[in-house]
Curated annotation (Swiss-Prot):
Organism of derivation: Clostridium botulinum (strain Loch Maree / Type A3)
Any one biological process term the GO annotation gives: translation
TM annotation in the entry: none
Disulfide bonds: none
Protein name per UniProt: Small ribosomal subunit protein uS3
């Protein structure tokens, strides 16, 4: 079966960073992991309309720092910073005896962010927009923004069909096996009257590590 590995997980430590930047011993590791999961779920649910792409969590002794990457930072920050204070107070109830710092990072090109594209397609499916139209429009916007390639997939009872199926659309190149290829991946679910529809998006943004490649070429030329 042609199952695909998660593109981010495959590249962690090669060209991608960890989303959780902390160390814990055996005694505290499980608690921290569950806490991270609760934090991510809460922020996603609470700020879904703001288009949260990803959440980085850094931990020190009694401090947790969240880097929230969002397409609409104003919606999270709120008027005079009220929104961010409200979010911090709610998160404080989930995390006991720890100070929370929240850093908002703006996603400059939301039309080229795989997670935001997937969520956008899912929202359109919930509004009963045809899945082909939703996918093709997202692909066109992404290609206009300058990405090298994009692939989208919708799985489930598409258009209310009795039998569930998967439909793919792609444009450009998506080198999934090339580790130096910067592949962004996003997943979202649409809750329709016929059940859930899963949306997956792969975006190829170009190769990373060009400097190292040039150094190797110079060394070969000098040899």
């Amino acid at each position: 079966m042609g199952q695909k590995v998660h593109p981010h997980g495959l590249r962690v430590g090669v060209i991608k960073e960890w989303d959780a930047k902390w160390y814990a011993d055996k005694k505290n590791f499980a608690d921290n992991l569950v806490e991270d999961h609760k934090i991510r779920n809460f922020v996603k649910k609470n700020s879904y309309a703001a288009g949260v792409s990803r959440i980085e969590i850094e931990r020190a002794a009694k401090r947790i720092k969240l880097n929230i990457y969002t397409a609409k930072p104003g919606m999270i920050i709120g008027k005079g910073g009220q929104g961010i204070e409200s979010l911090k107070n709610k998160l404080q109830k989930i995390v006991s005896n720890k100070n929370i710092l929240i850093n908002i990072v703006e996603v400059k090109r939301p039309e080229a962010d795989a997670q935001l594209i997937a969520e956008n397609i899912a929202q359109q499916l919930e509004k009963r927009i045809a899945f082909r139209r939703a996918m093709k429009q997202s692909i066109q916007r992404a290609m206009k923004s300058g990405v090298k390639g994009i692939k989208t997939a919708c799985s489930g009872r598409l258009a209310g069909a009795e039998i569930a199926r998967t439909e793919h659309y792609n444009e450009g190149t998506i080198p999934l096996q090339t580790l130096r290829a910067d592949i962004d991946y996003g997943f979202a679910e649409a809750d329709t009257t016929y059940g859930k529809i899963g949306v997956k998006v792969w975006v190829y943004k170009g190769e990373v590590l060009p400097a190292r490649k040039n150094i190797n070429e110079k060394e070969e030329a000098n040899a």
